[in-house]
């Protein structure tokens, strides 16, 4: 069996493309989606996971481990953008941005690390953004959430 990969946000966009590439290279890929039953034509299995819900994260990681017996690679790809002048962005949207782009990936890492430590191997890739290295006009909250994830990744 190839290395087992879990990709958050694996049902569309960059996550789906990464998953398809790795699948064709022989990796055992599991993608995640908030609504996997709505996704058509995925070439790899999708498990239900909402990065804003810690229980959902723990269940999805546990399901992959129970199915495969291991977890070799986690790609924290799920993310959401937010734009606008700071004073016009509702606080709820700001919190949702941080829950999705920062706290969600932290919860995924917390759920995956015990298995990786047991295996004595594992790789976690956190997808950030150039916006995390410099503030972009009207993208301050997004930049802050990606910058926070970048710093945790480096630590």
PLM feature segments, named:
Residues 129:
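Residue(s) in the substrate-gating loop at a strand-loop-helix junction
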Residues 87, 134-140:
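Active-site loop immediately N-terminal to the catalytic Tyr-X3-Lys motif
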Residues 11-12:
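Conserved glycine-rich cofactor-binding loop
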Residues 63-76, 82:
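A glycine-rich helix->loop->beta "capping" turn
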Residues 43-55:
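Rossmann-fold cofactor-recognition segment
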Residues 109, 145:
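Active-site helix of classical SDR
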Residues 85-86, 90-95:
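Substrate-binding pocket helix/loop in short-chain dehydrogenase/reductase
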């Amino acid at each position: 069996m190839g290395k087992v990969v879990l990709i958050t946000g694996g049902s569309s966009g960059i996550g789906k493309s990464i998953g398809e590439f790795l699948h064709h290279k022989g990796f055992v890929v599991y993608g995640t989606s908030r609504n996997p039953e709505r996704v058509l034509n995925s070439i790899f299995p999708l498990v239900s996971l909402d990065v804003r819900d810690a229980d959902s994260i723990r269940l999805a990681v546990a399901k992959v481990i129970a199915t495969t017996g291991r977890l070799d690679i986690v790609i924290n790809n799920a993310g959401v953008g937010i734009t606008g002048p700071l004073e016009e962005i509702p606080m709820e949207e700001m919190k949702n941005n941080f829950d999705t782009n920062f706290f969600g990936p932290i919860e995924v890492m917390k759920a995956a690390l015990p298995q990786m430590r047991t295996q004595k191997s594992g790789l976690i890739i956190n997808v950030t953004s150039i916006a995390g290295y410099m503030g972009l006009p009207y993208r301050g909250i997004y930049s802050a959430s990606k910058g926070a994830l970048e710093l945790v990744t480096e630590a």
